[in-house]
C-alpha cells in the first residue's frame, strides 16, 4: 500500500516537472517584435535608473555640524538651491522635539496673518458661528484701540509670557544685550501691598440670631507708580520682517521685563495689520500697536514706552545678507515726537544678524519689479522684498527664516528733557545727530563680538 502511494507521488511530481519545462519553453520563445519591445523597455528602465541615481547624488541630508552657524546649506550654487545647480538638503528624520517645536512656532509667526484671515472667513461663512461673529464685528467696528492708545489696556503679560515665545527666540537664537541699565519708568508703590477684606454674616430671620460670621483677609499689590522717563526705542535694521524686534520686545522670549524692569514697551507696526479681525486683538495682547503719530503720542502720555522700526518699508527693500545699510537721514518724525512729549529718552537699538535671515532678490533700481514694489509702497504704505530662505522639510528653499543668530543690542539713552509744543528744525536736527552718533557707537563697539568686524554702518538715505 505504501509502495503504491510512493509511486503515485513520483508520477505526479514527474507530470509537474514536465508541465514546468513545457511552460518555460513556451514563455521563453519570442518573436522579433517581442524582442524589440523588451529592448525598448529595458532601455527606458536603464535611463530612469540613471536619472534617479543622478538626482539622489544631488540630494543630501543636512548635517548641523558642517552647515555653519546660520543653518544655511553648505552646498554649491546660489543658496544651495538645486534648481540653480547646487545640492538640495532635506531635513533628517531624527531631530529633537524641541527643534521641531521651534520651527512650528516660527512657521506660525511668519504666516499668522494668513491663518487668522482664513479663520475669520470660515467663521463668517458658517451660520453656526454667527452668534459669535455678529457681536464681535460690532465690537471690531466700535473699538478703536489700535488708533487711540488703547493698547495700554490690552497689554497682556500672560500672552507675552507664553512658553512658545521662548521656542521662537531659541530658533535663531535671539539674544538681548544692554549697554547700560535704564532708569525704570514704573516703580512699586512705596505704600506696599494693599490690605483687602471680605466679610460674610448670616442671621436667622426674623430673629437676630447669628448663624455665620466669616471674614477673609488678604493683601494685593498696588499698581506701580510712574516716576521715571519714558522711552522711544529705534530699531535698526528693518530686514525683511523685523524678526528680532518681535522676539525681544513684543514677547518675553528674551526676558524683556527682567532685563529692563519697569519699562513696558509697545512695538509699533503698520496700521494695515490691525484691519484683520481677531488678528488685531492678538497683536494688541502682545503690546503691538499702530505707528500712527496720534496713537504713539497717546501711548507715551500713559507712560508706556514704544519701539519704532525706523527704516520701515524703504529699508526692507535694501535688505541683503550682511548688509549694514540704513534709511535714517530723512526719518526725523520720531525725534519730533520725543520733543513734543518731553521727559523721553531716545534709545537706538541695532540687531546684528537681522538681515542674514533671508536671501533677498536684488531687483535693481530701474527694473519693473522695483517699480512695482515702490508702487505698492506708495499705494498701500508697505512693500515686501522678493525673498526666500528655507522650508519646513528642507534647508534650501521656502519662506521660513534661516537659523541665524540675531543679537539685539540696546544702546545708551539720549535724554530729551522738557516738552516743546512747536520744536524747531534746529532742535530736531540736534537730537537727530545725537541719536545717530549713539547708534554708530552701538555698532562700532559690538561689531567685533557678532561677526561684523571690518564693516561700517552705512546711512544711505
Curated annotation (Swiss-Prot):
Pathway: Glycerolipid metabolism; triacylglycerol biosynthesis. One of its GO terms (biological process) is intracellular triglyceride homeostasis. GO terms for molecular function: 2-acylglycerol O-acyltransferase activity; diacylglycerol O-acyltransferase activity. It comes from the Eukaryota. It is a multi-pass membrane protein. Residues 21-33 have a biased composition (Polar residues). It catalyses: an acyl-CoA + a 1,2-diacyl-sn-glycerol = a triacyl-sn-glycerol + CoA; a 2-acylglycerol + an acyl-CoA = a 1,2-diacyl-sn-glycerol + CoA. Residues 1-38 are annotated as: Disordered. Residues 134-230, 280-332 are lumenal. Belongs to the diacylglycerol acyltransferase family. This is Diacylglycerol O-acyltransferase 1. It comes from Eremothecium gossypii (strain ATCC 10895 / CBS 109.51 / FGSC 9923 / NRRL Y-1056) (Yeast).
Amino acid at each position: 500500500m505504501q509502495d503504491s502511494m510512493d509511486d503515485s507521488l513520483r508520477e505526479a511530481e514527474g507530470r509537474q516537472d514536465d508541465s514546468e519545462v513545457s511552460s518555460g519553453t513556451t514563455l521563453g520563445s519570442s518573436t522579433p517584435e517581442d524582442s524589440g519591445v523588451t529592448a525598448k523597455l529595458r532601455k527606458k528602465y536603464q535611463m530612469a535608473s540613471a536619472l534617479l541615481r543622478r538626482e539622489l547624488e544631488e540630494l543630501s541630508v543636512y548635517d548641523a555640524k558642517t552647515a555653519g552657524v546660520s543653518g544655511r546649506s553648505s552646498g554649491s550654487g546660489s543658496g544651495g538651491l538645486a534648481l540653480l545647480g547646487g545640492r538640495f538638503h532635506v531635513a533628517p528624520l531624527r531631530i529633537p522635539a524641541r527643534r521641531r517645536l521651534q520651527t512650528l512656532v516660527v512657521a506660525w509667526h511668519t504666516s499668522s496673518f494668513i491663518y487668522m484671515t482664513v479663520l475669520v472667513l470660515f467663521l463668517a461663512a458658517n451660520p453656526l458661528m454667527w452668534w459669535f461673529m455678529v457681536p464681535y464685528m460690532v465690537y471690531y467696528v466700535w473699538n478703536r484701540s489700535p488708533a487711540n492708545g488703547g493698547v495700554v489696556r490690552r497689554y497682556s503679560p500672560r500672552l507675552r509670557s507664553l512658553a512658545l515665545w521662548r521656542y521662537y527666540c531659541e530658533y535663531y537664537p535671539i539674544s538681548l544685550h544692554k549697554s547700560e541699565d535704564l532708569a525704570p519708568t514704573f516703580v512699586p508703590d512705596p505704600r506696599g501691598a494693599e490690605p483687602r477684606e471680605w466679610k460674610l454674616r448670616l442671621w436667622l430671620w426674623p430673629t437676630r440670631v447669628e448663624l455665620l460670621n466669616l471674614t477673609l483677609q488678604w493683601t494685593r499689590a498696588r499698581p506701580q507708580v510712574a516716576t521715571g522717563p519714558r522711552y522711544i526705542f529705534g530699531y535698526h535694521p528693518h530686514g525683511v520682517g523685523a524678526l528680532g524686534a518681535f522676539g525681544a520686545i513684543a514677547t518675553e522670549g528674551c526676558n524683556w521685563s527682567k532685563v529692563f524692569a519697569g519699562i513696558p514697551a509697545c512695538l509699533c507696526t503698520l496700521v494695515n495689520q490691525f484691519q484683520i479681525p481677531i488678528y488685531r486683538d492678538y497683536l494688541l495682547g502682545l503690546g503691538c500697536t499702530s505707528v500712527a503719530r496720534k496713537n504713539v503720542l497717546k501711548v507715551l502720555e500713559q507712560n508706556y514706552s514704544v519701539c519704532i522700526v525706523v527704516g520701515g518699508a524703504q529699508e526692507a527693500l535694501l535688505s541683503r545678507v550682511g548688509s549694514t545699510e540704513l534709511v535714517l537721514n530723512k526719518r526725523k518724525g520720531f525725534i519730533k515726537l520725543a520733543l513734543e512729549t518731553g521727559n523721553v529718552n531716545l534709545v537706538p537699538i541695532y540687531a546684528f544678524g537681522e538681515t542674514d535671515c533671508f536671501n533677498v532678490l536684488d531687483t535693481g533700481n530701474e527694473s519693473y519689479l522695483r517699480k512695482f514694489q515702490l508702487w505698492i509702497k506708495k499705494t498701500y504704505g508697505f512693500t515686501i522684498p522678493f525673498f526666500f530662505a528655507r522650508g519646513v522639510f528642507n534647508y534650501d528653499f521656502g519662506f521660513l527664516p534661516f537659523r541665524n543668530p540675531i543679537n539685539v543690542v540696546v544702546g545708551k539713552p539720549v535724554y530729551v528733557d522738557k516738552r516743546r509744543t512747536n520744536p524747531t528744525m534746529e532742535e530736531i536736527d540736534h537730537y537727530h545727530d545725537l541719536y545717530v552718533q549713539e547708534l554708530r557707537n552701538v555698532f562700532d563697539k559690538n561689531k567685533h563680538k557678532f561677526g561684523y568686524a571690518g564693516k561700517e554702518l552705512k546711512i544711505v538715505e
